[in-house]
Amino acid sequence: SAGSDVYKRQTYRINHPRHVMSSGMLPSFNVLGEELEPCSSDPLTGWFRDGCCNTDRNDRGLHTVCCQVTTPFLEFARQQGNDLITPAPRFNFPGLKPGDRWCVCAQTWQDAAEAGVACPVDLGATHEESLQIISLELLEQFAL
């Protein structure tokens, strides 16, 4: 039942050794309530550039959705002022091409979905904080 799933998830979090993070990073759970899986090491993604869509309170953009980017998504993001194509070495950002996996901002992905250009999502590697902005049902429609 749904209630027992919530209980199991809460129990797992409490008993899981990674629950307490000294770095201020929020606990690493995905939108399915399981341990967060890596998103990409090539290119190396994540707010912390650790390959995962981890987040903390300083990540105002919530870079938490693990996507396999597409040309329509990249063009949409650029039109919105979020250029994910052009390399920015000072931010350790290589620039993305279609097929790359990247932790994108939850609001950018939500806006792209509303515009009909959402890209595929890896649910296992998408941080649960994404659910502040995007419904699980919508994410599931674009699951890899």
Where are the regions that the model predicts?
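Short, small-residue-biased leader/transition segments that mark boundaries at the very start
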Residues: 1-7
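Intrinsic-disorder-associated, low-complexity terminal segments enriched in Asp/Asn/His/Tyr and depleted
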Residues: 12-16
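A charge-rich, low-complexity, intrinsically flexible signal that marks solvent-exposed coils, linkers
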Residues: 22-144
